[in-house]
Every structure is written in C-alpha cells, then in structure tokens.
Swiss-Prot record:
Record flagged with keyword Transmembrane: no
Record-listed E.C. numbers: 2.3.1.-
Superkingdom to which the source organism belongs: Eukaryota
Role played: Acyltransferase; part of the gene cluster that mediates the biosynthesis of helvolic acid, an antibacterial nortriterpenoid. Protostadienol synthase helA cyclizes (3S)-oxidosqualene to (17Z)-protosta-17(20),24-dien-3-beta-ol (protostadienol). The synthesis of protostadienol is followed by several steps of monooxygenation, dehydrogenation, and acyl transfer to yield the final helvolic acid.
A Pfam family recorded for this sequence: Transferase
Protein name: Acyltransferase helD1
Active site: 145, 415
C-alpha cells in the first residue's frame, strides 16, 4: 500500500469537485459509437498511470489528509452507462448545449465531494449517457480537487482518450516517457526556493487569523465535511449564463485601452476580462449593510462596511517554479486582487477599464517562486487554515468573487476514436449564489474568442444583463 500525503496546495478548496461534460456527435451513425466496453477497458489501462484515482482519502491528523492506494483493493471508480431516449443530439445543438436542454441526471455528483454508497469518496466518477437514436454521447467526468487541479484533470482525460484510441487501432501508445505523469507531492518541496517573499496583507490575515468555526471544519474527516458542506451548497440558489466574447471584440478592447496604460505595460486577455467582470458585477447590485448575528462571528471588524472588491484568481505556478515533471497534483496559488469599490463602481469606459485591468496585472506580476514558497509555508504551519477563506467569502457575498481562466486547458483534444468533442462545459452543479466566472475556450480555439460561464445571485445577474458596456461586448449564448 502506498500512502500519499496531500500538500498544502491540495487542501485549497479540496472538497470541491471538478465536473465537466463532453459532448460527442455520432456524425457517421456508427452502431458501435464510443462503445462502453472499450471505454471501460481503456479506463483501467489508463489508471495504471494515474493510480491515485483509485485511492482512498484518510484524515491522519488535524488538517492533514493522505490518499491510500492499495493496488490489491482499489477504491473502484463510479462508471455507469445510461440511455436517454427523450433527447436527440439535434435538440442539444439547436439549444447551443444550454443547461436546461440537457437530459436529467447527466451529473452523478454534486458540487462537493461526498461519500458514495460504500462510504468512500470516489476519486473518479464517469457517466456515459447515450442520446436518442444513437445520435451522440454525453460523457460526464468528475474528479475531486483533493487529488488534481485543472492541469491534472485534463491530463488524465486526454491520456484516457489516447489509450482507447490506440487500443481501437491496435497500436502501441507513444513512448512511455512522454506519457509518464507524476503525483509525487515531494516534487513541490524540491522546487521551492530558499528565499521568501512577503504575502499581501489580506492573504496573510485570512490564513493567519484563527477562526473557531471554520477551523473546526478542518478537524472533520473528508466524508463528514463533504456531507455537511453538500447540505449548505444545496441551499444556494443562483442564476448562471454562458456568454461569448468574440475575438474581434477583445482585440478592439485592447486597442481602446492602449492610450490609458503606460507604454511599457502589456495587458493580457485575462487582465481585461477580470477587470470587466469585476466592474460589471459591482455595478449590478446595491451593497448591503455588514452582516450581524451569527455571520458576524465569521468576520473581524464587525459593523465595518466593506470598502474593496476582492477577486480571487487561481494561478498555476508550475511555470514559475520551473517544474519539469508532468505533475498532476494541485499547484494553484490563489492571488487576491483588491480594488476600491468606488473605483469599480465608476461607469465602464476604456479609461476606467484600463485602470482596473492594470491593477489586475500588477497583482498577477507579484507571483514569483518566493511568494509561492511563503504561501506554502503559511498553510503548512497552520494545518487548519486551508478552510479559512470560507469565512471571508461567506461574509462578502456581494464584494468578492472568483475568476478562473481555463483557456489554456486542452479541453477539445479528448478523441476516444470517433472524433473530438463538439462542446465542453462545466455542469449545472457549478451554479450557485456565490459569484464565479469561468473563462473557457471555444471549440474554434483562440480565433473563436472566449466563453464566460458566469454564475451569481439572481439580483446581480439581472443587473449584469442590463449593463450597457457589457452588452456591447458580449453575446449571450444561453
């Protein structure tokens, strides 16, 4: 048996699931389109390279979790196949794959990792749903954040697809070195530098300040924590929409903000998108009074109104640490972008958007090896602190949000032998009342612009859809 201790990076949001659905059209009307036996057989072969996905989560001490991998007694993935006679591929295509057009039951898990019938949290859930008249397949795949981030998730999906494709063609897979993946958490320590850079005051405060309620959550086992958080997640009601920003519109925004930024500055698409989403969100709703009663316990400085908007941006730090291995565990640093509410509330124009985007750029440029090391040390020294961001977000539901850019993920590469997916998207379990924006690639790649899958509370979403500047840039897909 192998015991894999999860790293401080693994514990950030570890209880949340990564639930995507991949849509495949049976263009050739193949009778054996993506056969289940082949999917299942190639899955077991693929797991030889990803044994951690057959492990069991175990709490070893306060705030410390390990994955126990027993090759002789694996934690079997939940893989199932169903047939949906009521929904044809053409219906999904006509609706632009809108969530409300999906057949019921595509996602077999919720937003939080919970125990299955056997009492274990499955580290891999797969649902193969065949559409009416064998017109296509929806492939739902979920992996909890405990063991992978987005890089690791798509590395597994694409490896599985390649394995099945090679098996169908009766070919050997490409050289072993290329398909070698690492889940050794010890890699992180080897790449951390000796120097340390100071964390920003907010991050240091969130993780360094004890909070009895959320620290207590870190004492719970993964199964108990999942059961508790899933009940609270079920109470959250929000509204979600998929927007598209065409490439031409993004390019025009870059040109329009140019006069308002220093000649040496270079803004990325993501800088502009985070700024645009933040401004549109803050302008969408009135700010409530600070929380009182029970929720006020979660928040220091009771009774003080919030003066800043906080955007949490998960940054993949493999490049910053120069990690050479194909590491599949979590290596995300949650950068906090703080902007005065008054600044974001100013009507959006090229000038005000440029100012907000420069603030995003300056925050992201702080990511360096020394900062990554300081963040790692802080969580490691305070094992229960990984739950503390929950207290921050729970008391700032209208002034904080998460934006995650996934445009670099190879979402549309998973060809199981019958073609690549026509559409890939997070599932409706992503929707909630807390504001999150996932910036996704389109099937056309960079030339197609980007999708923005945005979920928020109902009041904010109504304001967002009425925002004049926002509507001038985006197309609402559904």
């Amino acid at each position: 048996m192998e015991s894999i201790p999860l790293s401080p990076f693994d514990l950030q949001g570890s209880f949340s699931n990564i639930p995507y659905a991949f849509f495949y059209e049976n263009t050739q009307s193949e009778n054996d389109f993506m056969p289940f036996d082949f999917l299942k057989g190639s899955l077991w072969a693929s797991l030889q390279r990803f044994p951690i996905l057959t492990g069991r989560l175990r709490a070893r001490s306060t705030g410390h979790i390990v994955v126990e991998v027993d090759a002789g007694n694996p934690n079997q993935p939940d893989i199932r196949e169903t047939l949906c006679d009521s929904v044809h591929w053409s219906q999904l295509k006509e609706s632009s794959f809108a969530w409300d057009a999906w057949p019921a039951g595509v996602a077999t898990v919720g937003p939080v990792a919970t125990a299955a019938a056997d009492g274990e949290i499955k580290l891999l859930n797969i649902h193969v749903m065949r559409l009416a008249q064998n017109s296509g397949v929806i492939l739902f795949i979920n992996i909890p954040h405990y063991v992978v981030d987005g890089v690791g998730y798509f590395a597994f999906i694409n490896h599985w697809a390649e394995t099945m494709r090679m098996q169908q063609q009766q070919q050997e897979q490409e050289n072993e070195a290329r398909s070698r993946f690492s889940f050794d958490r010890g890699i992180i320590q080897r790449y951390l530098p000796t120097e340390r850079a100071p964390l920003d005051p907010l991050t240091a405060s969130i993780y360094g300040q004890r909070n009895l309620l959320v620290d207590w959550l870190a004492w719970l086992s993964p199964t108990t924590l999942g059961g508790l958080l899933s009940k609270t997640a079920a109470m959250a009601r929000g509204e979600a929409h998929l927007f598209r920003i065409p490439r031409a519109s993004l390019d025009q925004v870059h040109k329009d903000v140019q006069p308002y930024i220093p000649a040496s500055a270079r803004l990325s698409d993501n800088d502009l998108l985070v700024a645009l989403i933040s401004k549109t969100y803050i302008q969408s709703q009135p700010q409530p009074k600070p929380p009182t009663g029970f929720l006020s316990w979660l928040r220091p400085g009771q009774g003080q109104p919030e003066s800043h908007c906080t955007v949490r941006i998960p940054c993949d730090v493999r490049r910053h640490l120069k990690v050479r291995e194909r590491y599949t565990g979590n290596l995300l640093l949650g950068m906090m972008v703080r902007t005065p509410l008054a600044e974001l509330a100013r009507p959006t124009s090229s000038e005000t958007l440029a100012a907000a985007a420069l603030n995003v750029r300056q925050s992201i440029e702080r990511v360096q090896p020394g900062l990554v090391a300081a963040y790692h040390d802080l969580i490691q020294a305070n094992p229960t602190s990984h739950m503390r961001p929950l207290a921050f977000t729970a008391t700032r539901t209208t002034t904080s949000l998460v934006t995650t850019s996934q445009v670099r993920f190879p979402m549309y590469e998973a060809d199981f032998g019958s073609g690549k997916p026509c559409f890939v998207c997070l599932t409706p379990v992503f929707a909630g009342s807390y504001t999150m924006a996932a910036i996704l690639p389109t099937p056309e790649g960079r030339e197609g612009g980007v999708y923005v899958l945005l979920t928020s509370n109902v009041e904010a979403m109504q304001g967002i859809k009425k925002n004049q500047y926002w509507n001038g840039l985006v197309e609402i897909i559904w």
